[in-house]
Design a protein with these regions (language model features):
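An extended, acidic
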Residues: 1-123
Length: 123
């Protein structure tokens, strides 16, 4: 929990996939308890740019399209952030489930996501 103490995270609600609200809220709660704050800008590209700029430490969201993340993904990677899907792989463009964070907090974020991950989101 030390890695997430004091961190500011960002996310977006799965409004296109409301059937995933229960596991999403469990992920949210699990992270909210450990971090300093969770923000919602409403634009994945902006959240990813904020990770790249160091304004937020990590970001996750369910069900995004590649065009929502492409530019921000490049910025985040160039700044040293790691971009994965919910199981730590590289299928985020196909699954739409993305986690982006600095290396210091990524492992803990993935752990909290996996604890609450239904099989339907583990692809």
């Amino acid at each position: 929990a030390k890695e997430m103490a004091g961190t500011v995270l960002a996310t977006g609600f799965p409004f296109k996939q409301k059937h995933h609200i229960e596991p999403y809220l469990k992920m949210f709660q699990s992270m909210f308890i450990e971090c300093a704050d969770i923000r919602r800008a409403g634009a994945p590209a902006l959240d990813l740019a904020y990770v790249a700029a160091g304004r937020i430490d990590g970001y996750w969201e369910i069900g995004l399209k590649p065009w929502e993340t492409a530019a921000g993904e490049l910025l985040a990677k160039e700044a040293g952030a790691i971009v994965t899907d919910f199981v730590g792989g590289h299928n985020y463009e196909n699954s739409g489930n993305i986690v982006v964070a600095n290396p210091r907090v990524l492992k803990e974020m993935l752990g909290k996501i996996r604890e609450n991950l239904p099989d339907s989101l583990a692809k």
